[in-house]
Amino acid sequence: MALIKELLGKTPQIGADTFLAETATIIGDVKMGSECSVWYNAVIRGDVNFITMGDKVNVQDNAMLHCTFEKFPLIIGNNVSIGHNAIVHGCTVHDNVLIGMGAIVMDDCMVESNSIIGAGSVVVQGTHVKSGEVWGGIPARKIKDISTELLDGEVNRIANNYVKYSSWYKVAGEKPEEILDL
């Protein structure tokens, strides 16, 4: 069972139909929407400020979500994928966003809807990623505008797939090959 810890009188609020891996950690002032998933060794730490997450947010293995004391909460919209080993800290991420594996999004950043932060990128403090942009690099910069194919083929596909993956883990006593119809 995941570690869900009350801190300073604040208990995480977990949305309906959410999957929490056994080694996931959720602490303090955290509010999650429905159909979210928090995977193995991911940490969501609402200890020094609050964290809100919309519906269909997946926080993949080893990701770290945190906020900044007395300055920046972490606000995440709907249909957001946060890749393996990513760090998302004290920023705002709107709807339909993919934050790639190992990416870092720092304090006071704004990532608008329908955007992608490429794997391994570092979005430095105070950066504003506008809607429909793809950013990458260290420090991250705009690479291009997002296409419909990229939005549907990556951002939406990954978010939807993680809802499906989490259903596999919620089904007790069934073999994955039976669930997948293999």
Model-inferred region functions:
Residues 1-13, 47, 53-55, 61-64, ...:
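Glycine-rich hexapeptide-repeat left-handed beta-helix
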Residues 81:
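Short proline/glycine- and basic residue-enriched helix-capping loop/turn segments at helix->loop/beta transitions
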Residues 14-58, 62-68:
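A positional/architectural concept
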